[in-house]
């Protein structure tokens, strides 16, 4: 079976630089059995969470790192990327401004956070309405999600099936569902 990419050039996107590589320079096995996705722009993912939900944040980051290995096309950002000496509020604002996918780990602690309510949710909701930013709510624990303005967005999981109420294999299936949704957004846009 001949390599279907043998007569085309491959666009490789690394660190926001586009490099076109003639396919004849790629070993045939380099592209076989791999899905190649052409990305117009690298998507920027902003992750909003309450620090009380850090274990779910960490699990999300692990899943995103695996997804990035397989499809690329995005950069994820959470407050873990803020380093000593940086103006943390400015870093969060910049990341919010740049993001076109927002992942919200919704819990009672998340909804109770004044910082999230006053600094993160307003730009997220504004961009979702005006700029086609995708808002993906991952329901971490039972909360007032259905009474909040976030309930306008279809959540990844059902309010009666939150991550905290699930055994680990079921949690993993919800994270995989979220990864499928992110991949769909990246491939479609």
Regions found by a protein language model. Name each.
Residues 77-80, 157-167:
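Inter-lobe coupling/hinge region of RecA-like P-loop helicase motors
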Residues 111, 145, 162-170:
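Short, polar/flexible loop-turn hinges at active-site or ligand-entry regions and domain interfaces
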Residues 1-20:
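Charged interaction/catalytic cores of defense and host-pathogen modules
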Residues 143-157:
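Glycine-rich, charge-decorated loop segments at or immediately adjacent to ligand/cofactor-binding or catalytic sites
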Residues 57-59, 114-117, 148:
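A short acidic (Asp/Glu
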């Amino acid at each position: 079976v001949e390599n279907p990419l043998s007569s085309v050039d491959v666009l490789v996107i690394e660190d926001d630089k586009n490099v076109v590589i003639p396919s004849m320079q790629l070993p045939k096995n380099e592209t076989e059995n791999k899905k190649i996705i052409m990305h117009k722009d690298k998507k920027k993912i902003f992750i909003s969470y309450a620090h009380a939900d850090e274990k779910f944040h960490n699990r999300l980051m692990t899943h995103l790192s695996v997804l990035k290995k397989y499809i690329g096309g995005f950069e994820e950002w959470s407050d873990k990327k803020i380093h000593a000496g940086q103006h943390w509020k400015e870093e969060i604002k910049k990341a919010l401004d740049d993001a076109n996918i927002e992942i919200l780990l919704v819990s009672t602690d998340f909804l109770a956070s004044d910082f999230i309510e006053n600094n993160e949710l307003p730009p997220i909701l504004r961009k979702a309405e005006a700029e086609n930013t995708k808002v993906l709510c991952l329901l971490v624990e039972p909360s007032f999600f259905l009474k909040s303005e976030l309930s306008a967005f279809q959540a990844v999981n059902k309010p009666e099936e939150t991550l905290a109420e699930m055994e680990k294999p079921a949690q993993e299936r919800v994270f995989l569902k979220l990864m499928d949704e992110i991949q769909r957004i990246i491939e479609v846009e």
